[in-house]
Amino acid sequence: AKMNLSSYILILTFSLFSQGILLSASKSIRNSDDDMVFNTFRLGKAFQKEDTAEKSVIAPSLEEYKNDESS
């Protein structure tokens, strides 16, 4: 009976231990996922800024082109 109890405790502690490892692993994975999402978001914002900068450069030349055509 004593043997069964000690092995039961061993299994219990082992399962708790492995659950703890899984939990911390999933937490760190989730954190890195958040970082990835955040970085992608920042990249997207940077691209948008470049996009608007390009548009403000292109737009005036387009306006000139339209004016040339109408005259």
Swiss-Prot record:
It is found in: Secreted. GO terms for cellular component: extracellular region; synapse. Keywords: Secreted, Signal. GO terms for molecular function: melanin-concentrating hormone activity; type 1 melanin-concentrating hormone receptor binding. The gene is PMCH. The keyword Isomerase does not apply. InterPro entries: Prepro-melanin_conc_hormone. One of its GO terms (biological process) is chemical synaptic transmission. This is Pro-MCH. Residues 1-20 form the signal peptide. Belongs to the melanin-concentrating hormone family. Its main location: secreted. It comes from the Eukaryota.
